[in-house]
Every structure is written in C-alpha cells, then in structure tokens.
C-alpha cells in the first residue's frame, strides 16, 4: 500500500505502547475504526485502529481565524491559505512480531491490507467459524470488505449463553 502519513511523537504528545499519532494529507478520507499499519523495529508491523481525526493549521488561536476573516465576515476571501494537516490518533492493537515498544517518530504509516486487517482484529484466529457479517474499511480504490465470523461453539452448545 501507499504511504498515507508519518508518525508524530512530541514532548507533549509522545508515542506510547498504547497510542500513537500521525499526520496525513488533509484531503485523505479516513474514518474512525479504520486499521493502519506502522513499520516498526525488527522489520515488524504495528497495527493501530483510528480513534480520532483532527484538523490543525498554523493559526495560533481561534481569534486569529476570526481576525483573518475580516473580523468575522463569512464572505471574506483570504489572501493566503493557512498551512494545514490532519492529525490522527490511533490505539495500538498489536504487532505481528510481538514487539511492544512505542512506534518511533517519522515512521511511515500505511492503510492495512485485507490480511493485515484480519490479523489486527483477530479475525484470522476464529475457530469453528460461522458467518456473522462484513466489515468495511476505507473508501474509494482502497476499499476493503472482509467477512466476519464468530466461533459457533459460543453461539450454540455448552459454551453458549443459556
């Protein structure tokens, strides 16, 4: 897959074993719960699930945005566009080689393949599968639609709810 961004680790918002953030282009369509992959040490891959997507500009405050719009004129046109990016926060859900240290600053972030999504969500480990539905990731040419299975022993039989 193509690179969609890079990991950001700052003094105020470091990467941890539980969370990481990355920047991406402001026109890239992502959704909460999409799965992303970060290249990590020992040629491993860390999987993250998107929790929050924010947009940030170089504006120091909301007041600066108001002033640059001719003091609140919604019809005013800006002479220059602000520099902006999308800032994405992810929850770490695993690593393919059991490497559990924070992902590093500047590492590339990718959309996950179908195989990587199954691995990240544990869908490749379901025993006694019975179809339960589908999960859809991404939009456009990157769209992935995957079947979701449940372990049939937990729906019916002695392990099931009574």
Residue ranges and their predicted role:
Residues 1-162:
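Basic- and hydrophobic-enriched, low-structure N-terminal and domain-boundary segments
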């Amino acid at each position: 897959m193509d690179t969609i961004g890079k990991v950001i680790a700052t003094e105020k918002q470091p990467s941890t074993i539980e969370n990481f953030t990355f920047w991406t282009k402001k026109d890239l369509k992502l959704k909460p719960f999409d799965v992303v992959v970060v290249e990590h040490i020992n040629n491993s891959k860390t999987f993250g699930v998107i929790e929050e997507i924010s947009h940030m500009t170089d504006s120091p405050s909301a007041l600066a945005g108001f002033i640059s719009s001719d003091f609140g004129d919604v019809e005013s046109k800006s002479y220059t566009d602000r520099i902006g990016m999308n800032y994405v926060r992810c929850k770490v859900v695993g690593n393919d080689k059991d490497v559990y240290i924070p992902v590093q600053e500047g590492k590339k972030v990718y959309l996950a393949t179908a195989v990587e999504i199954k691995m990240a969500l544990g869908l490749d480990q379901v025993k006694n599968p019975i179809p339960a539905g589908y999960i859809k990731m991404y939009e456009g040419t990157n769209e992935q639609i995957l079947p979701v299975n449940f372990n049939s022993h937990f729906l019916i039989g002695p392990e099931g709810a009574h």
